[in-house]
């Protein structure tokens, strides 16, 4: 069937900010879809609230709107643009829920706008628990015994009848939000109450637990002619009970018989046909390991995290195909872009193994509960490809960037065999390392299987890795064992550890013995047809399929898995660097390990190496490709950390030299630059011992800001106010040494601001100054940023501009640099310099219309800014105001304290733009899912230091008609100032307390700045958690409250008595 001619304009809805459960995979799928529709000649309008995406670049669609994904704003865009159709299935759960809401509001019918790809009835049948259950019963497909509950009592009745444990699955939520496994009555009451609160339709499915069954996923495609195929089958290493986003996953399935695969494949095809979905679907199933009995767990009627993984695992671009199918093309009409010859109706075939491991944020959040369940906690994931499972598994392990190169780098010596075996359940993020340690101790595969229900096939693969470790340690220097270990994925560093050598020595032995990797192509057809894809992975075999181009090449290092502090912003910069390299006439090569991102779409670069970002793996590619140079500035700390070892191996690092990169990170060298330029800077010292740190802090005077050197996202950064707090920090957060000093600075109270600088060593251009709303002490990644500045004096802006330009020149910056300031007593103090692309690059690029990463890459390749039409200085701003706001995922991590501080906690960002600051702020709050009430009750519970400032804010709320509530200390202070206030008791004292008020929906806003306290049961912490659980706007910084009040005041009319 040819593509539809009756539609011309299509609106694509993006997925919004990155949160746990919905990450960069939707930037990848949305970008693919928009480009795919443009390729077919359609006029594409794109709306998304996330500025850190490739998807929101001007060239991706004909019109791009960075606006809140709310009904109000989408309706405005629909009325203005009048598209013929909406494609909602590529924007994750956000896109689907928006389509449903627009339809129910009657907007689609009124404007005669059609939904493409998936009809609303199919969305409802898959997402509404009751309709899904009815459909499965009609199809005679088995689902676990269950009941749809709209009250806690209904949930409890089911469990009392069918027994515990039960699984709670809320309807229309993301990443298992609000769900869980309840083993007791009280757990069920708590989980179901929370799930009902978070479900937009107040509905949860309570089902008999089938935890322990094998979890299998199928990615399925269907077109309007009812042609359907399975793109990929994937098997979870973890049995049912761990959210698939937190599961280790292999592709293709590893432990099923052909009969089992065909049985479940048939069921998947039957379901997509029954739903009449035109596009892609993810179907999750559970298989009883003891029989041929299976259950359908869930159907996602959209492109998902798993489909991004399946696309990268097979090379089959699901989102691109789904977009073409949505406009009427059929699978037998679409060419498979990987082969360039076969049609899209051919099911991909794999002659390799893919291994995905999630990346969790527990290195950032020491207090978080590391146990895994049905609610997702991972921020990102890595994928690795190998010729056998051991190879793929070990490549994935070293891709995680958690300081390990193999399974023997993380051991649990402090635990007995019994304690370690017991710690395996419930599953934790480090279970793979626990299993290896148990096997090393001689605990049997059968014992571990009985405890975890992980298939013995997978456990045997881990056991094989442990056996190879043992063999290596008794055959030091043996090349035969070395080759066998390399074929099974062992890193040089792991082998070096077992041989008592350095990784460089092992590398030399390997090269001397000609034990070198070859590169195989990912071609979707298991080499059955000729292929033209430039997508490769390393393995230790004979035939190399990657041929070095005659054209000079440049390698760009990606940023690895998405984690807090290093998000999709760096992938954005990586993709732009590739475009600039290609336009300059070079071959652009990407190395990355993240299956969710645009950079690992093989059509972006001239060559893609899906490999770990370690020194060994990068050098192997460099040995083959012999590039002109390597770009490290866009890969976050991952790539920057490789700069020096790469240079030591003779690699040409493009842009700022390694010596100058190190000068920015080395405290004494950097201080020297600051002194030479006579720039104001907070008093700071370096310490390499605990006593040295105490002496430094006492000399500077408390409070001090303390942090390790070489970090990203403020990891292990704190403000401490006494010797006791400092000693606690030194024991808990860092291992201090000569090689790893800590930096101690005077903590200056003041507003923060920052600039990105583009420099070629002679000309330094500042695209804009970003002013933070929160004062110093809140990490810049967690602050709201405003461009252009609204409150900074001209004197301060001039000081910042001059300081940044002088720093760029003094540091010999070639490319990008980020400079952060604190404004104290109307003077700009330099607090940090990052000699690389920062997380603000996408935002400042969008609002100034300057492709900074591309310009920086051109500079690295030798172009001069003067020749591009730039001169040194600050570029003037236009009349619009833009706000970048952080997004947090605290609902997924209830054990993490939401009080903001110098350690970064946000997972994503949104942008609000308008003609005035209050309007831009309003959009930013709406895009952040912060309700902006017109009136209601506001709770104040603030630290002593904040009480005077809180009075003014409370008066402003009171003038708007809000009723004031407070905890006892804050309330007494308000009463002294004659403010009308209702005082709530301490939580332990009575039911008239803040948490109860939040649970009963009596409070509309919570302002809580009571200091962090490691006790999870402290009142401040419990109030913060209750606000998050009940979706009540929570503010932990008074500056943000003031900005929120600016919005409320701008939207309200004054009512005054006549004088």
Swiss-Prot record:
EC number(s) reported in the record: 6.3.4.16, 6.3.5.5
Region Carbamoyl phosphate synthetic domain, residue ranges: 547-929
Positions annotated to bind Mn(2+) 1: 284, 298
Classification via InterPro entries: ATP-grasp (IPR011761), CarbamoylP_synth_lsu (IPR006275), CarbamoylP_synth_lsu_oligo (IPR005480), CarbamoylP_synth_lsu_oligo_sf (IPR036897), CbamoylP_synth_lsu-like_ATP-bd (IPR005479), CbamoylP_synth_lsu_CPSase_dom (IPR005483), MGS-like_dom (IPR011607), MGS-like_dom_sf (IPR036914)
Residues covered by region (Allosteric domain): 930-1059
Pathway field: Amino-acid biosynthesis; L-arginine biosynthesis; carbamoyl phosphate from bicarbonate: step 1/1; Pyrimidine metabolism; UMP biosynthesis via de novo pathway; (S)-dihydroorotate from bicarbonate: step 1/3
UniProt keyword list: Amino-acid biosynthesis, Arginine biosynthesis, ATP-binding, Ligase, Magnesium, Manganese, Metal-binding, Nucleotide-binding, Pyrimidine biosynthesis, Repeat
Positions annotated to bind Mg(2+) 2: 298, 300
Positions of Mg(2+) 4 binding: 832, 834
Residues reported in the UniProt entry to bind Mg(2+) 3: 820, 832
Domain ATP-grasp: 133-327, 671-861
Enzyme class: ligase
Positions contributing to Mg(2+) 1 binding: 284, 298
Binding site for Mn(2+) 3: 820, 832
CDD domains with a match to the protein in the record: MGS_CPS_II (cd01424)
Recorded domain comment: The large subunit is composed of 2 ATP-grasp domains that are involved in binding the 2 ATP molecules needed for carbamoyl phosphate synthesis. The N-terminal ATP-grasp domain (referred to as the carboxyphosphate synthetic component) catalyzes the ATP-dependent phosphorylation of hydrogencarbonate to carboxyphosphate and the subsequent nucleophilic attack by ammonia to form a carbamate intermediate.
Subunit details: Composed of two chains; the small (or glutamine) chain promotes the hydrolysis of glutamine to ammonia, which is used by the large (or ammonia) chain to synthesize carbamoyl phosphate. Tetramer of heterodimers (alpha,beta)4.
The family this protein is said to belong to: Belongs to the CarB family.
Function: Large subunit of the glutamine-dependent carbamoyl phosphate synthetase (CPSase). CPSase catalyzes the formation of carbamoyl phosphate from the ammonia moiety of glutamine, carbonate, and phosphate donated by ATP, constituting the first step of 2 biosynthetic pathways, one leading to arginine and/or urea and the other to pyrimidine nucleotides.
Protein name listed in UniProt: Carbamoyl phosphate synthase large chain
Organism per entry: Leuconostoc citreum (strain KM20)
Recorded name of the encoding gene: carB
């Amino acid at each position: 069937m040819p593509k539809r001619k009756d539609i011309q304009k299509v609106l694509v809805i993006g997925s919004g900010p990155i949160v746990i459960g919905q990450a960069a995979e939707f930037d990848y799928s949305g970008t693919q879809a928009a480009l795919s529709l443009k390729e077919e000649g359609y006029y594409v309008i794109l709306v998304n609230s996330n500025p850190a995406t490739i998807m929101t670049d001007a060239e991706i669609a004909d019109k791009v709107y960075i606006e809140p994904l709310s009904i109000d704003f989408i309706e405005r865009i629909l009325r203005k643009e009048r598209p013929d159709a909406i494609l909602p299935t590529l924007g994750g759960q956000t896109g689907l829920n928006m389509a449903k809401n627009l339809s129910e509001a009657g907007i689609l019918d009124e404007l005669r706008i059609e939904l493409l790809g998936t009809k609303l009835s199919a969305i409802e049948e898959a997402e509404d628990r009751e309709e899904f259950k009815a459909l499965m019963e009609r199809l005679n497909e088995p689902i676990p015994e269950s009941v749809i509950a709209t009250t806690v009592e209904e949930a409890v009745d089911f469990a009392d009848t069918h027994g515990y444990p039960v699984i709670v699955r809320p309807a229309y939520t993301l990443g298992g939000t609000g769900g869980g496994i309840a083993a007791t009555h009280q757990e069920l009451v708590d989980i179901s109450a929370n799930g009902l609160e978070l479900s937009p339709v107040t509905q949860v499915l309570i089902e008999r637990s089938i935890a322990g069954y094998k979890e299998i996923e199928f990615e399925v495609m269907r077109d309007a002619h009812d042609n359907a195929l399975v793109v990929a089958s994937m098997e979870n290493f973890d049995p049912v009970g761990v959210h698939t986003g937190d599961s280790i996953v292999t592709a293709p399935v590893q432990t099923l018989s052909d009969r089992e695969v065909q049985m479940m494949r048939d069921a998947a095809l039957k379901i997509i046909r029954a739903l009449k979905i035109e596009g892609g679907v993810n179907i999750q199933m559970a298989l009883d390991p003891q029989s041929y009995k299976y259950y359908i767990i869930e159907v996602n009627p959209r492109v998902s995290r798993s489909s991004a993984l399946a696309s990268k695992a097979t090379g089959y671009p699901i989102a691109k195909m789904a977009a073409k199918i949505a406009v009427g093309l059929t699978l037998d009409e679409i060419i498979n872009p990987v082969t360039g010859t076969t049609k899209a109706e051919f099911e991909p075939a794999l002659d390799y193994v893919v291994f995905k491991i999630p990346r969790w944020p527990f290195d950032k959040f020491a207090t978080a509960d590391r146990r895994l369940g049905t609610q997702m906690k991972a921020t990102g994931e890595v994928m690795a490809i190998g010729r056998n499972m051991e190879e793929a598994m070990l490549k994935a392990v070293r891709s995680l960037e958690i300081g390990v190169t193999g399974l023997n780098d993380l051991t649990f010596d402090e635990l007995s065999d019994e304690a370690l075996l017991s710690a395996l359940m419930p599953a934790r993020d480090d279970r793979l390392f626990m299993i290896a340690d148990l096997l090393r101790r001689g605990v049997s595969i059968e014992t571990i299987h009985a405890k975890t229900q992980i298939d013995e096939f997978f456990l045997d693969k881990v056991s094989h890795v442990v056996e190879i470790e043992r063999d290596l340690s008794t055959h030091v220097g043996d090349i035969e064992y070395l080759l066998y270990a390399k074929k099974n994925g062992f890193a040089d560093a792991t082998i070096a550890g077992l041989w008592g050598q350095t990784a460089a020595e092992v590398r030399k032995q390997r090269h001397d013995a000609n034990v070198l990797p070859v590169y195989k192509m990912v071609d979707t057809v298991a080499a059955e047809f000729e292929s033209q894809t430039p997508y490769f992975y390393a393995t230790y075999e004979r035939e190399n399929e990657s041929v070095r181009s005659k054209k000079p090449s440049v390698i760009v290092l990606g940023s690895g898995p998405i984690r807090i502090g290093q998000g999709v912003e760096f992938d954005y910069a990586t993709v732009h660097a590739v475009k600039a390299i290609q336009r300059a006439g070079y071959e652009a090569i990407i190395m990355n390990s993240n299956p969710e991102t645009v950079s690992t779409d093989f059509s972006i670069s001239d060559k893609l190496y899906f490999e770990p970002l370690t020194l060994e793996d990068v050098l192997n590619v460099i040995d083959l490709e012999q590039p002109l140079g390597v770009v490290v500035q866009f890969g976050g700390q991952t790539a920057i950390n490789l700069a020096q070892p790469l240079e030591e191996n003779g690699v040409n690092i493009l842009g700022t030299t390694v010596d100058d990169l190190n000068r920015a990170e080395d405290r004494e060298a950097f201080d020297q630059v600051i002194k030479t330029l006579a720039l104001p800077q907070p008093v700071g010292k370096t310490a390499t011992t605990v006593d040295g740190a105490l002496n430094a802090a006492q000399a500077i005077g408390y409070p001090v800001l303390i942090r390790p050197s070489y970090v990203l996202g403020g990891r292990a950064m704190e403000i401490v106010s006494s010797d006791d707090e400092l000693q606690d920090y030194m024991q808990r957060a860092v291992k201090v040494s000569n090689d790893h000093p800590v930096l101690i600075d005077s903590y200056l109270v003041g507003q923060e601001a920052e600039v990105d600088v583009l420099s070629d060593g002679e000309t330094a251009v500042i695209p804009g100054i970003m002013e933070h709303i929160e004062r110093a002490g809140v990490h810049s990644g967690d602050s709201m940023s405003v461009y252009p500045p609204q409150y900074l004096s001209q004197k301060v802006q001039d000081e910042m501009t001059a300081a940044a330009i002088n720093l760029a020149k003094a540091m010999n910056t070639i490319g990008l640099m980020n400079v952060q300031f604190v404004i104290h007593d109307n003077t700009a103090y330099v607090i940090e310099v990052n000699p690389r692309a920062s997380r603000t690059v996408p935002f400042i690029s969008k609002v100034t219309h300057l492709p900074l990463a591309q310009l920086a890459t051109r500079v690295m390749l030798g172009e001069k800014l003067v020749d591009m039409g730039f001169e040194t200085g600050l570029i003037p701003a236009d009349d619009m105001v833009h706000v970048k706001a952080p997004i947090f995922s605290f609902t997924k991590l209830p054990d993490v304290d939401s009080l903001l501080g110098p350690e970064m906690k946000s997972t994503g960002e949104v942008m609000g733009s308008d003609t005035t600051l209050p309007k831009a702020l309003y959009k930013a709050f709406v895009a952040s899912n912060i309700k902006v009430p017109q009136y209601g009750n506001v709770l104040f519970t603030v630290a002593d230091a904040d009480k005077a400032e809180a009075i003014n804010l409370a008066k402003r709320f009171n003038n708007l008609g809000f009723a004031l509530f407070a905890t006892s200390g804050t309330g007494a202070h308000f009463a002294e100032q004659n403010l009308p206030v209702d005082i709530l008791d301490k939580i332990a004292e009575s039911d008239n307390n803040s948490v109860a008020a939040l649970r009963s929906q009596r409070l509309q806003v919570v302002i809580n700045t009571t200091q962090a306290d490691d006790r999870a049961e402290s009142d401040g912490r419990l109030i913060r958690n209750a606000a998050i659980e009940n979706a009540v706007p929570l503010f932990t910084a008074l500056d943000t409250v003031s900005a929120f009040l600016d919005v409320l005041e701008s939207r309200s009319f004054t009512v005054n008595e006549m004088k």
